[in-house]
């Protein structure tokens, strides 16, 4: 299983040699992780991870969705159900099931990330299998008890410079405060994710809004609601936040008059919003968040286009983030126009657009980001955060948007040990792409070195104000 030093590079010798040189120049750059879903309590408490299954299997919906697709119940993977049905609690049994089915992950990015962690973090070069499952489980479990495997030690070992978590608008951020108070040098910052108090289609929307204005100490009115967001954004900024994040079903925006927006708020806060009112409210709030970003400087990320909880049976029994979110088409040109008409020409605003609709990359997103000063393209995301996905992204966007209307790489992960693996993969694929441009005489090699550095490090640091 030993990692091949030429993985993800071209098989053509000349191009491969260029890629080697480029990668050598960026391989050891610090990691900027400006968007992700690791838990702030890890860094605050610095406790040992419990066991291999809890580290690699249970929290990783890339893993659990593949196993579920092959008929393995989520309970057998240790996922707790809402209805109290028993789920597997024996970490070794969960690991054995994972190991027995490891062949399912052939040619997937999950395999690349996992095997990178096995070798570079644990020193394990055997390919996982049913036969060696217990031995590898024991080897990992033994190392997890050691001080060098605590979250803060791994932060240094991974050469992370900054990492952003993703946090609800009403989160008190106590673990971020604990990190700051501890005097530890690690930079763990929050990102403002207000979806629960913005998505009027959620059954708990009204209660989330009440919680928001309660925490902020503002009245339950349209203006009070907006002031509550401003209050919380400032609270996040004082703890280092540089960005907000918005995971909406679509990229629809709106620019209503103050009166129309206030009346819309009065309708949706009653808790029985129509589908059209819920969509209009989300749309208006993207524009309001852009307005706030101009005032307070938070970089705005929009992650649209996921059909969340496509499998109602899984959602009802297990809740969110269980692998049943499916990409859907997204129409950026028309949906973003109200926001862009209002603020798209303002260089004080940075809106980073992500997509699960690859067909939109060359047709809509690259032309939009290649024109509007306020827009940047986020990297290949979620299902497409893979060698082929990143390569397609570069091929579909570079000719129209260039490199400098993109923002480098986000690992966007819940799996802490996959962070260096994901950055390694992105750097390798980008270097392979740049090597091809050099070999085709479309880019000079000295330029390729500069671009490789920018894609691996500078663009993320600059765009996210880190």
Swiss-Prot record:
Keyword Nucleotide-binding among record annotations: no
Enzyme class of the recorded protein, top EC level: isomerase
Pathway the protein acts in: Carbohydrate metabolism; pentose and glucuronate interconversion
Biological process terms in GO annotation: D-galacturonate catabolic process; D-glucuronate catabolic process
Residues in coiled coil: none
Keywords on record: Isomerase
Reaction(s) this enzyme catalyzes, per UniProt: D-glucuronate = D-fructuronate; aldehydo-D-galacturonate = keto-D-tagaturonate
Molecular-function annotations in GO: glucuronate isomerase activity
Keyword Isomerase set for record: yes
Annotated SUPFAM superfamilies: Metallo-dependent hydrolases
EC identifiers of the protein: 5.3.1.12
The family this protein is said to belong to: Belongs to the metallo-dependent hydrolases superfamily. Uronate isomerase family.
PANTHER family: URONATE ISOMERASE (PTHR30068:SF4)
HAMAP family found in the cross-reference section: UxaC
Name assigned to this protein: Uronate isomerase
């Amino acid at each position: 299983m030993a990692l091949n030093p030429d993985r993800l590079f071209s098989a053509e010798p000349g191009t491969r040699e260029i890629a080697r040189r480029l990668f050598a120049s960026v391989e050891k750059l610090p990691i900027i992780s400006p968007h992700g879903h690791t838990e702030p309590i890890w860094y605050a408490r610095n406790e040992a991870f419990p066991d291999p299954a809890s580290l690699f299997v249970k929290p990783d919906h890339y893993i659990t969705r593949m196993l579920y697709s092959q008929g393995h119940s989520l309970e057998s993977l240790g996922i707790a159900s809402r209805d109290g049905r028993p789920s597997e609690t024996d970490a070794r049994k969960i690991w054995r099931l994972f190991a027995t089915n490891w062949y399912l992950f052939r040619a997937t990015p999950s395999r690349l990330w996992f095997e990178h962690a096995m070798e570079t973090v644990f020193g394990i070069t055997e390919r996982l299998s049913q036969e060696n499952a217990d031995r590898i489980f024991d080897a990992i479990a033994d190392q997890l008890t050691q001080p060098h495997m605590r979250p803060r030690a791994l932060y240094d070992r991974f050469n992370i410079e900054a990492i952003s978590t993703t946090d609800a608008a009403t989160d008190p951020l106590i673990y971020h405060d604990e990190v700051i108070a501890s005097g530890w040098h690690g930079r763990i910052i929050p990102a403002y994710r207000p979806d629960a108090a913005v998505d009027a289609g959620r059954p708990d929307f009204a209660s989330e809004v009440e919680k928001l204005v309660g925490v902020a100490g503002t009245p339950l009115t349209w203006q009070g609601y907006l002031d509550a967001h401003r209050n919380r954004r400032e609270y996040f900024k004082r703890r280092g936040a540089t960005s907000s994040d918005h995971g909406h079903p679509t990229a629809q925006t709106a620019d209503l008059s103050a009166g129309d927006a206030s009346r819309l708020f009065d309708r949706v806060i009653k808790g029985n919003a129509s589908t059209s009112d819920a969509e209009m409210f989300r749309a208006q709030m993207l524009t309001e968040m852009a307005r706030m970003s101009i005032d307070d400087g938070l970089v705005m990320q929009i992650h649209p286009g996921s059909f969340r909880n496509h499998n109602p049976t899984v959602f009802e029994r297990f809740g969110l983030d269980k692998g049943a979110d499916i990409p859907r088409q997204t129409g950026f040109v028309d949906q973003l126009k109200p926001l862009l008409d209002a603020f798209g020409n303002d260089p004080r605003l940075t809106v980073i657009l992500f997509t699960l609709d690859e067909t939109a990359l060359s047709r809509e997103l690259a032309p939009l980001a290649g024109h509007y000063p306020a827009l940047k393209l986020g990297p290949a995301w979620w299902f497409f955060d893979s060698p082929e996905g990143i390569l397609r992204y570069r091929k579909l966007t570079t000719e129209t948007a260039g490199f400098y209307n993109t923002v480098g790489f986000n690992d966007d992960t819940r799996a802490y040990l996959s962070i260096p693996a994901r950055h390694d993969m992105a750097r390798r694929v980008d270097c392979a792409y740049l090597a091809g441009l050099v070999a085709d005489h479309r880019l000079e090699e000295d330029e390729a070195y500069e671009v490789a550095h920018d894609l691996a490090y500078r663009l993320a640091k600059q765009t996210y104000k880190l």
